[in-house]
């Protein structure tokens, strides 16, 4: 039956929600600026449409638990340590709540809404899994996860979390009241989801799927109980298979829990335990209001006790909530989720055995259980594409649970004016739009800055800061633009504004230190970097590098050497050479070499020749090119890393001339170009044989890198040195230079 006129706004809201569910995974999993802005904007507008008053609608009355949660969230937001991320987190949280409420209301008031939303979810999962498998067959363009199913998420555990929910949505569709075509598609969705879960190689998601299926089976036990011996054997085999998959990881935890000769612990498990310990320390220090919504990554730098062990979240949703919103909020969410699962299972059991809704409700209860378990061991919630599906499934499952989201007419609750809620949603939509435009202005400003258009860059960045006064990126790039415009004092003032907004963010202090260091304000640089090191001594080696370089200018040799010893005791040579450091901070070995050269000069100045030689040897060793891949071992000799590609280019030039060296450039950059002409002119004065002698700096990741290094050669009795800067890109065939190297006379300057 066609919907009546009063239902049309709600129908439109359901269609918008369904479209967002399909589109969000392709917007960088919902993490990109356009993905987050689109999510909040569309869901907020859909929620406003769904709230349009109809004469038969009862007043909106929220139950006590939801009201208490709102109070705790508000208090946490007031006392946040990082306002910008808090605003974004609150916008996303509001979008999830609205999606959940829309799904629940639509499932009750529109006969086809539940069916349409579940079909949308499993169809989206089928499309994502199909394309992901195609990429997997092709090797995912190489990289660390070349042999795992990652899809558009770029991370196998996230892909697993997405397929987990899509698979249960397909299972909920396998009921007798669905048409054959729909059932066939859902059956294919179940099969593809199971295969995809296996191909992610994620043991945690397989465990979550098994527990979710167990809940589904227990709710539907009347169907298999008569044949319980057969099903019991199948369940036992499944349990044994699960233990075999998970056993080696559990055994890897033993050396962490009971130190001894138990072997080397699993790196991933070790990382998670460290993060959880530091997160619990954060909860103990901020038990009432937490550190603020979305502020966990900034707060973690204060508690980090080992380098290269950090992250955006602790891979445990409940600990993250307790850390960000306070312990009471963590307990409230955990308790409410347990209460919901119990009520959902009981509601399904009360339905008649032949009712298709019973099987559907059982599958939805299994989906929520699986998501709840996987959220305790991974980061599903941090991917908006997954969180939105979870919120939608939660809403559909709660539609048959009266009083859960809306208070009963005679129950305890508070009546909310629809006009007020619509106004809140419209404000959220406007905020999402302005924040996205502010992010776009930052991107345009960076482009103008790179092109040398300083007035244009300044205008864009100023506008961005006006639209989002709390944003760090706009102030960061505006400070550098102001510095390049010849106003070091103005640049320092811009950077110090970020400290006033978020004084506990060490990156704000480090930005002021960088600007002051380049601008020659050594005392300001020393103070700023010292504050960054005090706040987050384990977060980044470059905090220590800045402090050492500033102290070398204004402090005594003893102060500088003391700062160096502190840095090298934390970021030891062994640690910066570790594969984990190579993946997370590939340039740290060269930063340590840089400050070791400074320390060697200071040791020479105080007459300690033995220590000078030791430190200089350390610097030489660390500054040698690293031929290992970044985050992965590539099978392309001579192009396994950015440094290897650069060495191959110069070696080919020395041995066989420039035409042979061109094969280490990106194919589209080979041949006569402006870069080729510039390089040909600069290399005429160079000896034929030049070698890479010293790596000064490397910045980038496993796909893109910028390398600053020195090449040297001999011309008669003269030693020729050139400072070179090169951008290198990763392709399936290995690393390639983006363009011909840019040469400067003499040694590189820091």
Describe each PLM feature range.
Residues 3-27, 37-51, 70-77, 83, ...:
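Alpha-helical transmembrane segments of multi-pass inner-membrane proteins
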Residues 103, 373, 427-446:
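Transmembrane signal-anchor/signal-peptide helices with a preference for the extracytoplasmic
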Residues 148-152, 209-213, 243-278, 284, ...:
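Flexible juxtamembrane loops connecting transmembrane helices in multi-pass membrane enzymes
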Residues 155, 273-314, 318-321, 325-332:
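TM-adjacent membrane-interface loops and short helices in multi-pass inner/ER membrane proteins
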Residues 230-246, 410-437:
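Internal/C-terminal transmembrane anchor helices
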Residues 442-639, 649, 657-664, 745-750:
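C-terminal luminal/periplasmic domains and tails of membrane-associated envelope-modifying transferases
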Residues 634-638, 643-644, 648-704:
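Short solvent-exposed beta->alpha transition segments
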Residues 687-689, 696-750:
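Exposed beta-sheet edge and beta->alpha loop/turn motif
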